[in-house]
């Protein structure tokens, strides 16, 4: 759906990382973890295109505290990396946005008996919070959160409040274990061989490493990808990624916006 | 006042209003059906179709530029057979003319494709892309050389009796000469413009941003060039023109009509606002009503010099 | 690290840094002297000069468009005599190369003007505008036909021994052919691009906004087209190129250099920020220092494909 | 000069008319009435060009009430007519602008013994307030303010506080006399034949009528013009207007930005 939204709050949770809460119509609660929103930052041509962000959280204000009935909202967690996110970060309570949501295919929850392993790299953590909230209702959930340094480690307390066991690592060792999140994950898997499935979001090299791990350990694994997007609805073919059957002779392109952003790792070509 | 008349006609294709969706920016219509009423727009122009499925270019395929965007999709498409099997059934349920945008890698492919499309009753007309700057095998040559263009147009003309629209490239010295060649070879109408060839560079990586190196520039940035070309062609000859390029609002659309366009296409705007085409059509109606204009056709070419 | 070397050379004109100001957007330098240090930029290119004073077009002459602007100044200028009498004395006091942009209404005027400028020691080089889309008597023909261009360039070449830069129009099918014709006829360097021809319309008045109907599109909107043309020409031949079109920042300038430009010109950006040229030059220095690049010349044509 | 400025206040003084106060360096006090500023509304490409506005007022905060020393400020009075002014109107205290000021040639004060007649049409009133402030120090000042309707009549009390005698007229008679401001002026001049000089700012047809009146009554008369501007400093030649000697053979174009915006009416060609 397309809707007008009002910024409720927009808080810097770590240097250059913001968490923004905005109003959304009640139907937003049907969004599946892993789905995303496309935000039109300004009603002007600069920036021109919408910017995609994972859904970090959803909710409804309790009626006791507002006069406006049950106001639903959604949240994004974003990193300021360029013009669009810079402009977003300067918005205040009461400013307006135009939103498309929920878009794409989210995570499949899978067998509740499986332990759920979430792997987030940097701001890739964003869609994993809403996912953790859903998964934690029926399953045991662990989070492996990695970043380059301690500033990239976000909202760990929020995950812990859900009962999620968290494992933090940073490339430079400024917080948690020192090293890549995938190294920490691999170590954990070597020790704990129970049934589990993986859910990963982060930079492409990390996802590729996670897919490799899933393959070696024969685990179910879903990854959430990023791509430059224009339409967000599968029309422009700007955001495609190679599907498992892709070759120059037999093209098999998938739209990250529509067929994804979440894919089972086996469905993609990882070269 | 009575409701203003928004209908226009392009070489026999009757449109309830002049606002169509531009090829490649609106998929096969269905992708946008959650966001607007497909029966409130003038026509749907489908993604550039080829004889066989086509993979298109490697990624990145798109990048934002100041006031516009570059794309080098490379005409990825499902091919005519899958189009008929998978896309047409939905389009058949929508009471809005469907115009198929097509291209060939060779002269023969253009003809063969036009022949196949000619047999489909759901197809209201053909829009032939001789202007796509991304495919080296043909597009660029047909679109920038009047003789080559005339050859394609002539062949397609002989292959179909459906209304034949030729889509022109802006990457030429003299668009009127190209227009003239196409009309003489049998085009019923002209769409202009397709994208301007451009490039974007990533300074830090020292690489072109698009995998294809260059791409087609669309969006508000190109509107002045598009308006100028529509006006030039409309001054030079009497052929129905479909104006395209950076149309974001009803005002933009009406400016193209004043410059001589009978109808318009909305492209990049669909990405900013998936309901853009409907909003623009409604905005045109509003404008006419507010200004006491009973028929949108009064505005076609009504620019005073 | 030592201060990076920003100097470049265009056919014998030594520039302290690669950032010049584009003709027509910077007057005769003096107009901007309150806002920047004219001795911190690479060169000043003066407003298009003709043999006799020229009135230019009626107004409106400018209008903003999405991400750009149209101008149809019509080459209003003081003429060579007033230039020598009124403008050169100030420029003589500034220790920065002055390149004179010139145009003629006829072939002969180009030659005569070049001869007169050849005699002025203050003039470091000539930039010949064969691409202005606003003057019907000549500009447009010389700029879009390779033979006519070669003729002008040849004549000017015989009329001056100063470095000879030819400024190309983007309104052509094949910019490489134009570039080739100019270089073969004796051009030392090429500036590209001049403005794209465009148009803007006032819906309510049903009139073109510019009195001249069409005008030249400049600003960020055209940057992708400019980058593409610089890259195409730099791939095709070994001639110093000056990149122009929508440069607003040091990043933009460096992208043009990666694409093959030896230097750049800043045009429309001077209107947004009268200190733009100096800011961009300083930004280039910063970038080099931060990235450990000792010489800006390393970046020329360093794009990896 | 070029300077960064902070919005101090931005108040709607009449429907669609805003008065904005912003910080300026101390040198701003040297601005001459009739000079103008060019505002870069946003550090983005939409809108692309700066927007010109007359200087409505200047001043310095009294040091007693601030801790920041003697902060100088300038004010503009503007009407929302399009994209740029729309965006301006949404700015708040604390937002930033980039300003060029003071630009152009202002009004010549003339002989203090002359009575000063100010003629403002709509938002053309803007530069006349700062002018009235200066003129009222040494001369008798009258203001003729016209508009289409009562919403277009601005800040009359402010003028009256300076001791200016005001004459209001509207085309539709919703405030003051009914009719064109130039008709009211003409009537006044027929009755009062003392030495006086005219200072006018408003739409071109009004200025033309005022110039005609000045000619018939043989009065000194300065008019402040508007034009589309790009550079604001006399470089682009976008803003030109025909000077008195203009003909196709002998071009005499003046830059509104640099040779104006204020001209003695005889220096221009009024066809
Ligand atoms: C499905 C999806 C979900 C996303 N979820 C989040 C999220 O929850 N939080 C978050 O902070 N970011 C998320 N992103 C990335 C986010 O969309 C980009 O960071 C943002 O669009 C950058 O906009 P900008 O204008 O600030 O940067 P720009 O100025 O456009 O570009 C700055 C740099 O950011 C990178 N970039 C720009 N656009 C994208 C893009 N679409 N995908 C990947 N990289 C890009 C490029 O490397 C570019 O050099 C998501 C992207 C996708 C596709
Ligand atoms: C020297 C000078 C002083 C001015 N002082 C004031 C002032 O004190 N208060 C005030 O409200 N306005 C003033 N103006 C006019 C003001 O600059 C324009 O209203 C403003 O630039 C419009 O910007 P916009 O983006 O809102 O409108 P746009 O969207 O750019 O255009 C909307 C409409 O406004 C008109 N317009 C746009 N730019 C100009 C312009 N430069 N000159 C005249 N008309 C224009 C056009 O008719 C256009 O159709 C002045 C103009 C000049 C040249
Ligand atoms: C992502 C994208 C894909 C496009 N694909 C096609 C295509 O397949 N065939 C075609 O004729 N034009 C194609 N175009 C060009 C558009 O139809 C249109 O001519 C152009 O974008 C200018 O209009 P706009 O500025 O409104 O976008 C494409 C444009 C974009 C942005
Ligand atoms: C107002 C204006 C006047 C111009 N006058 C000239 C001119 O006299 N001669 C010329 O060769 N180019 C002229 N140009 C073109 C510029 O020099 C430059 O090529 C063009 O604006 C593209 O650069 P930009 O996008 O940085 O502005 C003019 C451009 C503008 C905007
Ligand atoms: S963003 Fe357009 S198809 Fe995915
Ligand atoms: S605005 Fe550029 S010369 Fe006046």
Swiss-Prot record, chains B, C:
Any GO CC annotation of this UniProt entry: cytoplasm
Localization, UniProt: Cytoplasm
InterPro entries the UniProt entry points to: Aldolase_TIM (IPR013785), DHO_dehydrogenase (IPR050074), DHOD_1B (IPR033888), Dihydroorotate_DH_1 (IPR024920), Dihydroorotate_DH_1_2 (IPR012135), Dihydroorotate_DH_cat (IPR005720), Dihydroorotate_DH_CS (IPR001295), Dihydroorotate_DH_I (IPR049622)
EC annotation from Swiss-Prot or TrEMBL: 1.3.1.14
Binding, substrate: 47, 71-75, 129, 194-195
Catalytic site: 132 (nucleophile)
TM regions (residue ranges): none
A Pfam match: DHO_dh
Reaction(s) catalysed (UniProt annotation): (S)-dihydroorotate + NAD(+) = orotate + NADH + H(+)
PROSITE patterns: DHODEHASE_1 (PS00911), DHODEHASE_2 (PS00912)
Record's cofactor remark: Binds 1 FMN per subunit.
UniProt keyword annotations, A-Z: Cytoplasm, Flavoprotein, FMN, NAD, Oxidoreductase, Pyrimidine biosynthesis
Intrachain S-S bonds: none
Necessary cofactors: FMN
GO biological process assignments: 'de novo' pyrimidine nucleobase biosynthetic process; 'de novo' UMP biosynthetic process
Residues binding FMN, per UniProt: 23, 47-48, 101, 129, 167, 193, 219, 245-246, 267-268
Family of the protein in this entry: Belongs to the dihydroorotate dehydrogenase family. Type 1 subfamily.
Subunit comment: Heterotetramer of 2 PyrK and 2 PyrD type B subunits.
Function (record text): Catalyzes the conversion of dihydroorotate to orotate with NAD(+) as electron acceptor.
Name this protein carries in UniProt: Dihydroorotate dehydrogenase B (NAD(+)), catalytic subunit
Organism whose genome encodes this protein: Geotalea daltonii (strain DSM 22248 / JCM 15807 / FRC-32)
Origin organism lineage: Bacteria, Pseudomonadati, Thermodesulfobacteriota, Desulfuromonadia, Geobacterales
GN (gene name): pyrD
